[in-house]
Curated annotation (Swiss-Prot):
ATP-binding is among the record's keywords: no
Pfam families, sorted: Ribosomal_L19 (PF01245)
Descriptive protein name: Large ribosomal subunit protein bL19
PROSITE patterns membership: RIBOSOMAL_L19
Keyword DNA-binding: no
């Protein structure tokens, strides 16, 4: 990578990002702007994918809200996310958990591991 681009992106990286992987349940505190007000909206769900590297790394969180699956994708190093809390660590054998989209109820559960 170009040294100039690398030096610019190093200043943008966040240092408070916890260690989480697909299968983990996280609580994302996202800043939402409504008109002139800004508030924190909490989005809690299972991390189904993590892709990219460096400043452009992204992760997708899936939750069930009102019986409907909702997915949101966040950049890891964005200032729009106040904090990321890891609630529990899940035991999975895949890097991408897109198969959870087709499962419902107890079939969509992920076994918890203690780390």
């Amino acid at each position: 990578m170009n040294p100039l681009i690398q030096s610019l992106t190093e200043g943008q990286l966040r240092s408070d990002v916890p260690n989480f992987r697909p299968g983990d349940t996280v609580r994302v505190h996202a800043k939402v702007v409504e008109g002139t007000r800004e508030r924190i909206q909490i989005f809690e769900g299972v991390v189904i994918s993590r892709k990219g590297q460096g400043i452009s790394e992204m992760y997708t969180v899936r939750k069930i809200s009102g019986g409907i699956g909702v997915e949101r994708t966040f950049p890891i190093h964005t200032p729009r996310v106040d904090k990321i809390e890891v609630i529990r660590h899940g035991k999975v054998r895949r890097a991408k958990l897109y198969y959870l989209r087709a499962l419902q109820g107890k079939a969509a559960r992920i076994k918890e591991i203690r780390r």
